[in-house]
Amino acid sequence: MKLKTHDDRLTLTNGSYHALVHARKPKGIENKSAYLIGTGIGALAAGCFLIRDAHMDGSKITFFEQLDLPGGSLDGEVLQNLGYVARGGREMGHHFEVLWGLFSSLPSTEDPNMTVLDHFFYTNYDDPNYSNCRITHKNGERYDNAKFNLGQDLAKELAEFVLIPDEELQDKSIDEIFSEELLNTDFWTLWRTMFAFENWHSALEMKLYMNRFIHHVGGLPTLSALQFSRHDQYTSFVKPMVIFLKELKDFY
């Protein structure tokens, strides 16, 4: 498979031989500048990659941000009369290849002897995420039996759903596509509570989530498929990128 790259000889391959090679400095990079809107994780990561892989001088990178705190929704700060506020945490998984590729080369602010990825990995290795009981009802009684209770017909309905062309799901809600029986299964309860879906949400978004996170299905009943940073994601993820960008340190 050909890649969209300045070098036509590069192709997608198996193994790590090509992935571990440091990128060459592109011709003419000294004459280029980058202007990034916002300081969410996407913009911060782009800045880090421009320095690490494109060898762009940090002085040529400009961020436009209206807020006092970088990180977009990955914020976290002490607010007067409110206490410490962070807008939620993001559920992480093994297959965030681009993110982990970046964090494998950024020093952790929580342990200077580790990279961000090292610290994240060992946090979850030593204290893996696991829920003995995902759902309760009737004032604390266990609700689920750690099974999806789908049956063959409903499992087939899900399989057929992910094969529907995107165009046919435009402007359709989940409850317009899924049967009432499927919406009353434990699978749907487990899925919707993990990914914050409502029945009236976009069917197309549901399909995209299933395509992206289907490998997490086995861990739905126990949340064992998920990993979390030790602290809020501003502290664990945003600060290391901001510090690197400010200090313009060499990655290698």
State where each predicted segment sits.
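Extreme N-terminal leader/targeting segments of oxidoreductases
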Residues: 1-34, 52-59
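Glycine-rich Rossmann-fold phosphate-binding loop(s) that bind the pyrophosphate
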Residues: 38-41
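Short amphipathic alpha-helical face segments that pack within enzyme cores
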Residues: 45, 49, 98-101, 236, ...
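A short, Lys/Arg-enriched amphipathic alpha-helix followed by its capping loop at the start of a domain
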Residues: 46-59, 244-250
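Glycine-rich FAD pyrophosphate-binding loop
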Residues: 51-78
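A generic secondary-structure signal for well-formed alpha-helical elements
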Residues: 54, 68, 74, 96-111, ...
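Dinucleotide-binding Rossmann-like beta1-alpha1 core, especially the glycine-rich loop
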Residues: 81-164
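Active-site/ligand-binding neighborhood in enzyme catalytic cores
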Residues: 156-252
